[in-house]
Amino acid sequence: MRFEHKDILDMESLSVQDITMILDTAEGMKEISKRPVKKVPTLRGKTIVLLFQEPSTRTKSSFDIAAKRLSADSISLSKSTSSIVKGETLIDTARNLEAMNPDIIVLRHPSSGAPHLIAKHVNASVINAGDGIHAHPSQTLLDLMSVREKKGELQGLNISIVGDISHSRVARSNITGFTKMGANVTISAPATMIPRGIEALGCKVAPDMDSCIENADVIIMLRIQKERQENILFPTEREYAALFGLNAQRLKLAKPDVIVMHPGPLNRGVEISNQVADGRNSVILDQVTNGVAVRMALFYLVAGGSRNADTI
Amino acid sequence: MLIRFKGAHIVDPGNINEQKDLLVKDGLVHALLDPGAADPEPGIDTVDVTGMLLVPGLIDLHVHLREPGHEYKETIQTGLMAAAKGGFTAVCPMPNTSPVNDNAQVTRFILDRAKAAGLSRVYPVGAITLGLKGETLAEYGEMKQAGMVAITDDGRPVENARVMRRAMEYATGLGLPVMSHSEDLSLARDGAMNEGSFATRIGIKGIPNAAESIMVMREIAIAELTHARVHIAHVSCEESVDAIRHGKQRGVQVTCETAPHYFTLTDKAVGDYDTHAKMNPPLRSEADRLAVIKGLQDGTIDCIATDHAPHSPLEKAVEFDQAAFGIIGLETSLVLSLKLVQDELLSMETLVEKMSRNPARFLGLDNRLIPGNPADITVIDPDRVHVIDPETFVSKSRNTPFAGIEVKGEVLLTMVEGRIIYQREI
Ligand SMILES: [Zn+2]
């Protein structure tokens, strides 16, 4: 089987076979990170541009490490260091990048759909590293990888997602990704954070957090953005923690072997208690490790890896 | 000079709906003749329009001609060329130019430019408040003397209800109608398309129906209080149609318009972040689209306007949430509206009411095709099938979501006061 996608823009455009192939490839990549010399020559001579028009040290580092482990040349461009100055449009930026002949462009952008726009104007592969409140496919793939690793399979699992669904690209991509792989997704949040028509993505909306996580195999907690408070989404962090925070007491409602995930960074004491974040059910650090492996797999596959010799 | 339009089916609501020949003399409708009747006098030029529809000239109550201030998007000249090509013999440009049309000098400038263009008639709409800021009333009296016909802060609502009350009272004293851009900005804030499952799916912040209907209800309440004539612009959703229907039933002097995109498309047209489908109010759900059609059928919606809003690619070839709101419409309005007739949702007569008679009433004009009235007419070729091609547009801008769509019907000829201002090359 070949991986036929030029770009990775969202989870909707990936089939079950595509996702399985990415996860299988990522497992192989993970092994590289455990070697004493964590580098293979697979993408030597390839250029990967990391274009982050929105700050995110974590995601950017993860993509950067992934590129380096495959021996690609990665360059980082951000709003301040590049020619992305006021007045230059995203299409201008795309054309300028294209003139540098990159093989892959990783884009993080505050506007939903920006990677789609860029992808139409460049020959390079575009990987969406998070666009607006739309999609964050590499995060979802690493979540899928982490769950598959711990649970063996994805089919039939109960996945609970709790937090600001309205403003979360992780939530949207995860709902699409997990349901596509046969899991049941239930979400919960204050009603101010549930966007209209979210059920159309295939999830259920639980009336409260307790019923959301009852019998959960996986709980994914989302970060509460304190700066969104001006939008009047909930009265106080105290009340949010009481109604929608994951603590040890509440965790008992889920299955005994439930795993707890979080895309980070954590607001300890708000959406997740210290005890749970650092407890035995938490796989938050495994997610970070898998993030590098998944991103290596994506680079490898969009660069034509499945069409070339196995040089891992 | 005498012209005889021969063989057309004339549709003039409440007056004629049959095959007649129309005789134009010295800029006026001169006579209506039975088919085959002899010329009443010598020296008549005959235009054979057999098989065509002939209607009183179309009037668009809501256009943006962008001049003064944004001539790179459209000028009065190019906007009026587009109007003529679309079959419009009169248009009402909105005041959100730069400078704003909030004083008599700007009103006169617009009318001077329109006169120089010598195409469709122009009835400028002035601002409700100075600079569209929602604070101080503009000098409606002096502007009216200069030729202004109605007031609106279109592009923005008048946020403060007390200012709107005073504007309606003051305008009523001068016999001016008030057009409302109905939008609660606190609800619409940050939104770039219709709120709903599609917006949620593609991660675009939504504008709820209530952002519009709440303001429609407010305007009706204030009109009821002040006995003003209020006209709701670009109605897009079911709740607004309902509110207007109830307002009319109570006897409030409320009229309204919708635009072809609201009965032709839904929010799904945004598709893969197509900024050509970004407008304000946004394209709504299928239920809203059907409610708009229902409103046209039962008379709740009086007019079809275009909200012709030209933008250059600079404003549209960007991220969806960064793109400007608005689409052009003058050259596609009639053909998109004819689809309602072809689908038997509206009669041709009702369509002419929405696009000509009711807008004329709003402006206080008598545009019936009776002897002595100005010869403002539009001749439509109802059968010509063609594909909408923005490259053929005479507007300066190309921002339309209708490119590539096959339509049936086209304007053949537009005449203002006996002068042919547009004629399709055959
Ligand atoms: Zn408006």
Curated annotation (Swiss-Prot), chain A:
GO cellular component: cytosol
Entry keyword Cell inner membrane: no
Pathway: Pyrimidine metabolism; UMP biosynthesis via de novo pathway; (S)-dihydroorotate from bicarbonate: step 2/3
Catalytic reaction(s) noted: carbamoyl phosphate + L-aspartate = N-carbamoyl-L-aspartate + phosphate + H(+)
GO molecular function: amino acid binding; aspartate carbamoyltransferase activity
Enzyme class: transferase
Binding site for L-aspartate: K86, R169, R223
Keywords (A to Z) from UniProt: Pyrimidine biosynthesis, Transferase
The keyword Plastid is annotated on this UniProt entry: no
Superkingdom to which the source organism belongs: Bacteria
Residues at which carbamoyl phosphate binds: R58, T59, R108, H136, Q139, G264, P265
Signal peptide from the UniProt entry: none
EC numbers: 2.1.3.2
GO biological process, one term: 'de novo' UMP biosynthetic process
Family recorded in the similarity comment: Belongs to the aspartate/ornithine carbamoyltransferase superfamily. ATCase family.
Quaternary organization: Heterododecamer (2C3:3R2) of six catalytic PyrB chains organized as two trimers (C3), and six regulatory PyrI chains organized as three dimers (R2).
Function per UniProt: Catalyzes the condensation of carbamoyl phosphate and aspartate to form carbamoyl aspartate and inorganic phosphate, the committed step in the de novo pyrimidine nucleotide biosynthesis pathway.
HAMAP family attached to this UniProt entry: Asp_carb_tr (MF_00001)
NCBIfam families membership: asp_carb_tr (TIGR00670), PRK00856.1 (NF002032)
Protein known as: Aspartate carbamoyltransferase catalytic subunit
From Swiss-Prot, chain B:
GO term, biological process aspect, one: 'de novo' UMP biosynthetic process
Gene Ontology terms, MF aspect: allantoinase activity; dihydroorotase activity; zinc ion binding
Co-factor(s): Zn(2+)
GO cellular component terms, A-Z: cytoplasm
Sorted UniProt keywords: Hydrolase, Metal-binding, Pyrimidine biosynthesis, Zinc
Entry note: cofactor: Binds 2 Zn(2+) ions per subunit.
Active site per the UniProt annotation: D307
Name of the protein in its database record: Dihydroorotase
Species, as recorded: Desulforapulum autotrophicum (strain ATCC 43914 / DSM 3382 / VKM B-1955 / HRM2) (Desulfobacterium autotrophicum)
Gene that specifies this protein: pyrC
